[in-house]
């Protein structure tokens, strides 16, 4: 039995089928109805005081737009090209462990939804199905693979070789989990995800250093992303090691508490990289306006983790596709109202520092939700 009343929009029950979702609020509301308290808190929670989680949202809410007018925006193009593929949106569905908590088939409906819509998916190494099974289930999807290091050099190299052999277009090392954080929502309920229960060998992650990056770049021909970059200094080191993708992330506020918001970090990373690598970013990106802000600030791809989980829990593959359709509509409208006909036209001149209009929390971008986020 669910511990909370169902979460609904302010005036209407949530739709029964994915095609009937009219906004992202309704997807989240349906996910809440379908999830037990533990799995819900796994999505919405962060580390310790959840300061980093809230700063992610506050940083996005602290950017306002500077629109231009009297420009032809009768046709707006939201697409980009990365990893040799045209994507309908500059979006990668970010690596999330234990997706099987939100759907019995885990990452499979996500990858199939990504293929159906036309964006990228990054599979977590602590998620079902494994990389071979997902490749078999969604051979034509744009698949990337993210690894938590739980073994020695040979173990890591084996994962790279398997990813290459099964058609993954990129390989990602997560580097901000040298120690596992205190996620106090989970601790309070003695809840341990399936991904955490089966994972061993965390000492290898704690000992990880730049020699692993150097070895991967020397031995393998696959685009490499480093996930967890939060400073200009580390971005420069990564680029000096030949890393193709700098992934700005604080693990969604789920690792180091009292960190900066991801989009606060982005400008210094963009300046440090100076065009020598592409940039991904995640951390509270959940609306089309958030995606536009990230691209204007210098990112190339925007990772979306929590929205992926909500969509998966709401309606499986169809929910993922509908979530992406709604995001595309939001991005297209935002660009048109900014006076911009394509993402390539965006730059920092379209952004302005401003005071947030609401107190930030993980779902403060969805004011129509009936949610007391502070009690669980």
Regions found by a protein language model. Name each.
Residues 2-84, 183, 192-203, 207-208, ...:
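An N-cap/entry alpha-helix motif that binds or orients negatively charged groups
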Residues 22, 47, 51-55, 105, ...:
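Conserved active-site and cofactor/substrate-binding residues in soluble primary-metabolism enzymes
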Residues 87-129:
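Glycine-rich active-site/cofactor-binding loop and its immediate structural neighborhood
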Residues 92-98, 141-148, 198:
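Short, basic, glycine/proline-bearing loop/turn elements
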Residues 98, 111-112, 133-137, 151-281, ...:
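Alpha/beta enzyme core
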Residues 116-137, 141-156:
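A gly/proline- and charged-residue-enriched helix-loop-helix capping module
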Residues 293-320, 353-357, 370-376:
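A compact, surface-exposed functional segment
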Residues 317-358:
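Internal helix-turn-beta structural module
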């Amino acid at each position: 039995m669910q511990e909370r009343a169902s979460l609904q929009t302010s005036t209407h029950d949530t739709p029964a089928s994915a095609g009937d979702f009219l906004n992202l609020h309704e997807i989240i509301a349906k996910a809440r109805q379908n999830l037990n308290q533990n799995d819900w808190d796994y999505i919405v929670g962060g580390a310790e005081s959840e300061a980093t989680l809230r700063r992610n949202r506050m940083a996005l809410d602290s950017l306002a737009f500077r629109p231009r007018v009297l420009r032809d925006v009768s046709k707006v193009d939201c697409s980009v090209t990365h990893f040799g593929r045209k994507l309908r949106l500059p979006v990668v569905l970010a690596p999330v462990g234990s997706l099987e908590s939100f759907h019995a088939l885990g990452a499979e409906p996500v990858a199939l939804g990504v293929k159906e819509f036309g964006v990228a998916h990054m599979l977590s190494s602590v998620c079902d199905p494994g990389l071979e099974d997902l490749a078999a289930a969604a051979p034509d999807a744009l698949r990337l693979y993210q690894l938590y290091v739980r073994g020695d050099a040979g173990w890591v190299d084996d994962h790279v070789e398997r990813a290459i052999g099964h058609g993954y277009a990129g390989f990602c090392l997560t580097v901000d989990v040298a120690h596992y954080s205190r996620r106090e929502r989970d601790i309070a309920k003695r809840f341990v995800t399936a991904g955490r229960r089966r994972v061993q060998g965390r000492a290898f992650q704690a000992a990880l250093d730049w020699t692993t990056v150097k070895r991967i770049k020397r031995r393998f021909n696959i685009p490499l992303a480093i996930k967890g970059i939060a400073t200009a200094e580390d971005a420069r080191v990564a680029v000096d090691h030949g890393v193709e993708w700098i992934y700005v992330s604080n693990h969604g506020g789920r690792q180091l508490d009292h960190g900066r918001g991801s989009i606060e970090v982005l400008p210094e990373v963009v300046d440090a990289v100076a065009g020598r690598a592409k940039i991904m970013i995640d951390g509270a990106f959940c609306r089309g306006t958030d995606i536009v802000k990230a691209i204007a600030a210098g990112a190339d791809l925007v990772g979306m983790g929590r929205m992926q989980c909500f969509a998966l829990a709401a309606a499986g593959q169809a929910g993922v596709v509908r979530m992406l359709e709604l995001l595309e509509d939001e991005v297209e409208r935002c660009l048109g109202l900014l006076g911009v006909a394509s993402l390539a036209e965006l730059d920092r001149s379209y952004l302005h520092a401003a005071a947030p209009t609401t107190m930030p929390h993980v779902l403060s971008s969805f004011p129509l939700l009936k949610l007391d986020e502070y009690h669980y």
